[in-house]
């Protein structure tokens, strides 16, 4: 889970750089959203490609959760959040930023990070509790 949180944090940082680029393009081209990505910056390519790593590591966590019968329902909820996050990102790029997609993308990125952190803390608590019981 620590690796997933670390990757998500990097992805959020890359996303803020993409957002900065979009804001600069919005100032240049105003509301002509079709021109915002005429020249795709390298940081966007990193952000888009790195999302594959983020989804993959979280999918692996779901796989482990199910295979080991850990019963952590929050890991499955995390995949739903990731799916919505990816869909909103794809919609922003291919459909010229439909209304609300930026907000959804930002809010769900925060939710994903929060749920991952909650799962991590919960795992530490379970481990501590099981160690206390064994002593």
Locate each region found by the language model:
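Polytopic transmembrane helical bundles with strong interfacial aromatic enrichment
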Residues: 1-135
